[in-house]
Curated annotation (Swiss-Prot):
Lineage of the species this protein comes from: Bacteria, Pseudomonadati, Pseudomonadota, Betaproteobacteria, Burkholderiales
Protein name (Swiss-Prot/TrEMBL): DNA-directed RNA polymerase subunit beta'
Annotated residues for binding of Zn(2+) 1: 70, 72, 85, 88
A cellular component annotation (GO) from this entry: DNA-directed RNA polymerase complex
Originating organism: Paraburkholderia phymatum (strain DSM 17167 / CIP 108236 / LMG 21445 / STM815) (Burkholderia phymatum)
SMART domains: RPOLA_N (SM00663)
Length: 1413
């Protein structure tokens, strides 16, 4: 009996399949699914609670209510399995068939499926070549459509109103046929010959010239070809039979009090059945046409609401005015089937609880409350109890566990040993948000967490909760242990830095112990070893920070590499160190020298220390070392007894004078403003600058006072040493707080921002130590509130960005070791404003070289192409001063579906070459998304203090060398003999003796050059200066000013300052000008020479025209004499807003969405020479003449800044009109490498501003996914249509096929898609549907009869298979190999049998490839 029951318990083996296909069901198909027709709208009898026969819950159609029991109760029990009761007609079987048996409704009149009617573009409209409006009028019985014009002059598919129709009937009689409603549309669809239509469309496409037509035809052709390929008939878009969902999936549940709770679908079905039955009756009664028509329209509307309520017209509502939830609503959106149930399942064997700190744990352990463990490990305990014979049955074992007998606790200990559990803290923003630990049983109800993993989980102990999951199967336990154990995940996958870095009190303790003090107790003593130092310290003979000499034993790598020689040998040397440092030397792992500890350990130093340990000593030693560091840190912090006291916040005495001086300067600016020397805007900018500087100065004075203290040394001399002030130590060590926060405590709070981001010009001069007055407190609240509001909004934004990133990259997995490409990108150090922002070593670390790395001095090859550059390699490269290395990149990887390991390089989370099967796409998405969330949550900590980088107003050299100017640099010499820059994109370079570029600086228009080309300079020399607050307009020629179109009230306004009474002329915006004629004129200056002739541009006919931009303040008068290099007008730069990641996060999203910026700059389309053509109204004409002499014209709005001058040679892709770059232009004109460099640099800029490190390769992976589609330019002999966008791998596969068959392959161009668009245009419809716009995706997929090959991770999660990544990739590979082998064996046997029986073999060509769908 038991065996029999076990048989029933066994789950059926899941079906093995390789793909899922979606299509349209034909009416016959729907009938074949059905188990009977639902004829009545009744559900269940409210008295007997039994389902009504032929109703929506009918047992005859859908199956029995109770297992193995018919409705009337005649047949009960298993023995009647499969019998159909003759009384009630119910089959005796399991009740769960009510979850899978469908019914159907025979519709009295056909009905259009709303998805194919209303999704944009309307599929019905496409196929019929009619407008949506027309089809709707026909379907909803407002108009007739001509089906068959016969001999009449009418056209097929012509629409006519009822009146027209009757007129035409009178005129032509029954020569023609016209219909209304879905029948008419169905006839039209039936009449379409798809093959014929496709042929005509293809030929028309070739012959037509108009862009609009090509677009229209291509769209229609795509839909028709889809029907042709998938074998779906267009008339199936019109329903004749409606399937009915199994009743258990739309349940009706009796509540107490005789009421019922029901699924909305039942209501919707009821309406359909009611209307359908009424319509049948009306047709039988031969009711008047108008009544029937109305009923048909109502049926159409009822079916529409069932399929997608609210898509057309008003949504159907239930009793409580709430719109009913239709079938479409069930699957779409966050609460729909895809995202709620398929991608976000709840799991068994899990629990959650609050976390508390567990400082006594080892890194791989976590404390699990006993009661929780007992519940989670129940099945294992039951099993153990049975095996040990304590309990005979599971029931008895249950009882034992419930009573919590002593034996149960012993067994729990045993079961739990070496059985890892997974801990997860929401939000899981990156892979380290779930890690495995070995549980240690503890009393209490809170989970204990190791302090060092908090950084990875972003956890703290202020009430955070974590979830525990138990891996059940042996394989799961093994994966948890080898891949997810906390001690195996010590690096951040985003940047390869250690994630187990101590923080807060640990750092404080280590820092305190490694500081040195002058004239501490016992200074100058010498000890024979660490144990002696310890004894002296315990006996209070020496202090922790005293300088002493100690003999220290280090374990160093053995030079002797022979057999049996130890790896490490001791080396003893005498070090001048401090007591604390020598005590810490005890925990150094072998292979690290004492010098790494012989300095004050701040947080950054400790991070570097752990990093060094990992690279030199390996994982195991590092983990042990980190644990011991933590223990020491806690112990030392306790011993140190550091605390905070109000008196620690020392306010600098010179604060008063600094603030006083600033106030004087501000007054001076007010006075200048009053007398009209500066504008209100300039005054504001200057005042803000003064207060920023003051805030800095006070802060500096405060830090100077705080950071050192006077002390007497051993010889009795006064000297200063680094301070032991508690607050200073906390900030300096990196334990808590920052200089900015200390400045607010003891310096001055400084400038605050308004909620809109603009800076309030009166700063808070007080600090928290002195206290704020009411006004100051009020201003402070602005910043604090903005911070809190921002946080909430930006967390959501950042989460959405992460979701889009994951969606676009989820199918990118490393699938092979090497794709063998010879392409790559050249990496250089990233230099900005003369400073090396990112060194070359950081950019190439962990990448594979694609060209040999050559020593520049000796020309010998250091590293061959194909070498993975590790730490030692990059250090060597840096030492030799190599400034460019070509490396492989994910962008140029030639693997079709996925990536290869060589192009990706090092797996940053593991520190070695990436494994095949690593889901690098998801890791990249998480690495970029995770800090976004972090940052967005982090803004308000500064309390809104306006931290604005002071604007640069000069450039100075950082290194010695020779000044060189780029070809684009142009300057003129003015009357004072100063060199004034007049080029917009000039750069100054500093080169070393070998002529290698050391730094590069942009020099803005209007700057004064202090050094010229070829000058030898020392570091620190100023190269150029300029006014940062205004942009000048400068003349390159001398002469007499002659104004044109400078008319007051038309193009310029006289601004009279209310305060000063002085007037200036300001150019006004064309949009604000009154009359139409004045909108096109542009105020400008012409110059006249001594004879009153217009000055001409040398070597051309054009006279000099200098235009003024909107907002320019004109500083010259009409008729004034000007010299070369003089300023004609100034444009004030806008008031500065504070920058934090608020600007940053949308910027990142904008880059990844590949949006074209508003006023994008214009790039040169060709290489050639520039000249200016004739200006049209409001636009200037720029002409580029290429090398063949062809001219390319650009029309440019006059207010734009043109960066080129007459006769300049520009290269293709060079910026010619100022403005933000458009990534699509960069891709088109400069190629993939330039595009990737642009996106990577721009994204990195945003993150760098926040001090977040992300490796470039993560961004490159995303860019690869944005480039995964191409646009066909010429289709050759392929199946594509010109202008169609297809998956790159598809394209390449098809071209390979063409080449193999000696046909013409297609040509294509790269296109850049934003991440949302790329996610939606993926080949997998399951993945796209679960992302966004579910209805549209499914509609399209159904018509095209799409097949999803389940390549990505998301599709596989949804269908419930192992994902094709990591161990799953190997599993699927093995499965496929086995299938292939089986198939070959099968074919072989078949062939042998065929040979034996002498039947002719089937030719190979006709054998259909076998796929499991």
């Amino acid at each position: 009996m038991k065996a029999l029951l076990d048989l029933f318990k066994q789950v059926q083996q899941e079906e093995v399949f390789d793909a899922i296909k979606i299509g349209l069901a034909s009416p016959d198909k729907i009938r074949s699914w059905s188990f009977g027709e639902v004829k009545k709208p009744e559900t269940i009898n409210y008295r007997t609670f039994k389902p009504e026969r032929d109703g929506l819950f009918c047992a005859k159609i859908f199956g029995p209510i109770k297992d193995y029991e018919c409705l009337c109760g005649k047949y009960k029990r298993l023995k009647h399995r499969g019998v159909i009761c003759e009384k009630c007609g119910v089959e005796v079987t399991l009740a769960k068939v009510r979850r899978e048996r469908m019914g159907h409704i025979e519709l009295a009149s056909p009905v259009a499926h709303i998805w194919f009617l209303k999704s944009l573009p309307s599929r019905l409209g496409m196929v019929l070549d009619m407008t949506l409006r027309d089809i709707e009028r026909v379907l909803y019985f407002e108009a007739y459509v001509v089906i068959d014009p016969g001999m009449t002059p009418l056209k097929a598919r012509q629409i006519m109103t009822e009146e027209d129709y009757y007129n035409k009937v009178e005129e032509y009689g029954d020569e023609f046929r016209a219909e209304m409603g879905a029948e008419g549309v169905r006839e039209l669809l039936r009449a379409i010959n798809i093959d014929e239509q496709v042929e005509t469309l293809r030929s028309e496409l070739k012959n037509t010239g108009s862009e609009a037509k090509i677009k229209k035809y291509a769209k229609r052709l795509k839909v028709l070809e889809a029907f042709q390929r998938s074998g779906i008939k267009p008339e199936w878009m019109i329903l004749e039979v409606l399937p009915v969902l199994p009743p258990e999936l739309r349940p009706l549940v009796p509540l107490d009090g005789g009421r019922f709770a029901t699924s909305d679908l039942n209501d919707l079905y009821r309406r359909v059945i009611n209307r359908n039955n009424r319509l049948k009756r009306l047709l039988e009664l031969k009711a008047p046409e108008i009544i029937v028509r109305n009923e048909k329209r109502m049926l159409q509307e009822a079916v529409d609401s069932l399929l997608d309520n609210g898509r057309r017209g008003k949504a159907m509502t239930g009793a409580n005015k709430r719109p009913l939830k239709s079938l479409a609503d069930m699957i779409k959106g966050k609460g729909g089937r895809f995202r709620q149930n398929l991608l976000g399942k709840r799991v068994d064997y899990s629990g959650r609880s609050v976390i508390v700190v567990g400082p006594t744990l080892k890194l791989h352990q976590c404390g699990l409350p006993k009661l929780m463990a007992l519940e989670l490990f129940k099945p294992f305990i039951f099993n153990k109890l049975e095996v040990m014979g304590v309990a005979t049955t599971i029931k008895a074992a249950k009882k034992e566990v419930e009573n919590q007998t002593p034996v149960v606790w012993d067994i729990l200990e045993e079961v739990i040993r070496e059985h890892p559990v997974m801990l997860n803290r929401a939000p899981t923003l990156h892979r380290l948000g779930i890690q495995a630990f070995e549980p240690v049983l503890i009393e209490g109800k809170a989970i204990q967490l190791h302090p060092l993993v908090c950084a990875a989980f972003n956890a703290d102990f202020d009430g955070d909760q974590m979830a525990v999951h138990v891996p059940l199967s042996l394989e799961a336990q093994m994966e948890a242990r080898t891949l997810m154990l906390a001690s195996n995940n010590v690096l951040f996958p985003a940047n390869g830095d250690p994630s187990i870095v101590p923080s807060q009190d640990i750092v404080l303790g280590l820092y305190y112990a490694t500081r040195e003090a002058i004239n501490g107790k016992g200074e100058g003593m010498t000890f024979t070893g660490v144990s002696e130092v310890l004894r002296a310290y315990e006996n209070k003979e020496v202090e922790l920070a005293s300088r002493v000499n100690v003999r220290i034993t280090e374990m160093v790598h053995n030079e002797d590499k022979s057999e049996g020689a130890p790896a490490f040998v001791p080396k003893i040397s005498l070090y001048a160190t401090t007591v604390g440092r020598s005590i810490l030397s005890e925990i150094l792992p072998p292979g690290l020298p004492f010098s790494v500890l012989n300095k004050p350990l701040k947080k950054k130093e400790i991070s570097r220390l752990i990093n060094t340990a990992f690279r030199k000593c390996g994982l195991r030693e590092t983990v042990i070392f980190a644990d011991q560091l933590m223990q020491s840190g806690f112990r030392l912090a306790t011993r140190a007894g550091i605390s905070i006291c109000v008196d620690d916040m020392l306010v600098p005495p010179q604060k008063e004078t600094i603030v006083g001086d600033a106030a004087k300067k501000v007054k001076e600016y007010d006075r200048q403003y009053m007398s009209g020397l500066v504008t209100a805007q300039e005054r504001y900018n200057n005042v803000v600058d003064i207060w920023s500087a003051t805030s800095e100065a006070v802060g500096k004075a405060m830090m100077e006072q705080l950071s050192t203290e006077p002390v007497t040394d051993r010889d009795g001399n006064e000297t200063r040493q680094e301070s032991f002030n508690s607050i200073y130590m906390m900030a300096d060590s990196g334990a808590r707080g920052s200089a900015v926060q200390i400045r607010q405590l003891a310096g001055m709070r400084g400038l605050m921002a308004k909620p809109d981001g603009s800076i309030i010009e009166t700063p808070i001069t007080a600090n928290f130590r002195e206290g704020l007055n009411v006004l100051q407190y009020f201003i402070s609240t602005h910043g604090a509130r903005k911070g809190l509001a921002d946080t909430a909004l930006k967390t959501a934004n950042s989460g959405y960005l992460t979701r889009r990133l994951v969606d676009v990259t989820q199918d990118l997995v490393v699938v092979e070791d090497d794709c063998g490409t010879s392409q790559g990108v050249a990496m250089k150090a990233l230099v900005e404003g003369g400073e090396v922002v990112e060194a070359l070593r950081d950019r190439i670390l962990g990448r594979v070289a694609v060209a040999d790395v050559v020593n520049p001095e000796t020309q010998e090859t250091l590293y061959e192409s194909g070498t993975l550059l590790d730490e030692s390699a990059v250090e060597e490269i840096e030492r030799l001063g190599i400034d460019e290395v070509r490396v492989r990149t994910p962008l140029t990887c030639e693997t079709r579906y996925g990536l290869c390991a060589s192009c990706y390089g090092r797996d940053l989370g593991r520190g070695s070459l990436v494994n095949v099967g690593e889901a690098v796409g998801v890791i990249a998405a998480q690495s970029i998304g995770e800090p976004g969330t972090q940052l967005t949550m982090r803004t308000f900590h500064i309390g809104g203090a306006a931290s604005r980088a002071a604007v640069a107003s000069s450039v100075e050299a950082k290194s010695n060398g020779t000044v060189r100017f780029t070809a684009t640099m142009r300057y003129v010499t003015n009357a004072k003999g100063e060199q004034i820059v007049i080029s917009r994109s000039g750069e100054a370079l500093i080169t070393d003796d070998h002529g290698r570029e050391r730094e590069r600086h942009k020099v803005p228009y209007g700057a004064t050059l202090l050094q010229l080309d070829g000058a030898q300079i020392k570091a620190g020399t100023q190269l150029a200066t300029w006014d940062p607050l205004t942009r000048p307009i400068i003349t390159e020629w001398g002469g007499t000013v002659k104004f044109e179109n400078v008319e007051e009230g038309v193009t310029v306004a006289k601004q009279i300052d209310d305060v000063t009474g002085l007037s200036t002329l300001v150019v006004i915006d064309a949009k604000r000008r009154g009359s139409q004629s004045s909108k096109s004129v542009r105020p400008q200056v012409k110059l006249l020479d001594a004879n009153g002739e217009e000055v001409k541009i040398p070597n051309s006919e054009h006279s000099v025209q200098i235009g003024f931009q909107v907002g320019a303040l004109i500083t010259v008068k009409d008729g004034q004499q000007v010299q070369v290099g003089e300023v004609l007008a100034r444009i004030p730069t806008e008031a500065q807003k504070t920058r934090d990641i608020t600007g940053g996060l949308p910027r990142v999203a904008e880059l990844f969405e590949a949006r074209s910026p508003k006023d994008a700059g214009i790039l040169a389309e060709v290489t050639g020479t520039t000249s200016f053509g004739k200006d049209t109204k409001g636009k200037q004409r720029l002409v580029i003449t290429d090398l063949e002499g062809n001219q390319h014209e650009f029309l440019i709005a006059k207010e734009k800044q043109v960066l080129v001058h007459d006769g300049q040679v520009v290269n293709k892709g060079e910026m010619i009109v100022d403005g933000p770059a458009d990534p699509h232009d960069i891709l088109r004109l400069q190629g993939i490498e330039a595009l990737s460099r642009y996106i990577v640099d721009e994204v990195q800029d945003v993150y760098r501003l926040q001090g977040v490190k992300i490796n470039d390769k993560h961004i490159e992976v995303i860019v690869r996914q944005m480039l995964r589609r191409v646009q066909i330019t010429d289709n050759g002999d392929t199946r594509f249509i010109p202008g169609e966008q297809v998956e790159r791998s598809d394209m390449l596969d098809e071209n390979d096929r063409m080449n193999a068959e000696d046909k013409r392959p297609a040509t294509y161009e790269n296109i850049l898609l934003g991440i949302t668009k790329a996610s939606l245009s993926t080949d997998s419809f399951i993945s796209a549907a679960s992302f966004q716009e579910t209805t549209r995706v499914l509609t399209e997929a159904a018509i095209m009869g799409k097949r999803d090959d389940l390549r990505g991770l998301k599709e596989n999660v949804i269908v419930g298979r192992l994902i094709p990544a990591g161990t799953g990739l190997a599993f699927h590979k093995a499965r496929k190999t086995k299938e292939m082998a089986d198939r070959e064996r099968f074919d072989q046997i078949a062939a042998e049998e065929a040979f034996e029986f002498g039947t002719p073999e089937t030719p190979a060509a006709e054998q259909t490839p076998h796929t499991n769908e």
